A protein has these predicted regions:
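The DNA-contacting recognition helix of HTH DNA-binding domains
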Residues: 3, 29-30
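Short alpha-helical "packing" element that flanks the helix-turn-helix/winged-helix DNA-binding module
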Residues: 5-12, 64
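Short helix-boundary/capping micro-motifs
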Residues: 11-26
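Alpha-helical residues within the helix-turn-helix
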Residues: 23-24, 41, 62
């Protein structure tokens, strides 16, 4: 996972969906969906439960969100 993957993951997790995350990242929702799918394939596990109502984090997704948010905060303090 690289920094861009983490930013996409965090934005989708925080927005609870692709459509809401798209303007934050200035990306198309379909592109975000492909990025999330690629990340999940690389990890070998689902990070989100997808439904028409949005994206909800799986247990692994919650753990990853917490760690990614910690890394994001540490990075922000360092610069």
């Amino acid at each position: 996972m690289n920094w861009d993957d983490m930013r996409v993951f965090l934005a989708v997790a925080r927005a609870e969906g692709l459509t809401a995350a798209a303007p934050v990242l200035k990306m198309d929702p379909a592109t975000l969906g492909r990025r999330v799918a690629r990340l999940e394939a690389a990890i070998g596990a689902a990070l989100f439960v997808k439904s028409p109502q949005g994206y909800a984090l799986t247990d692994l997704g919650v753990q990853m969100r917490d760690r990614a948010a910690e890394a994001e905060a540490a990075f922000s303090l360092a610069i």
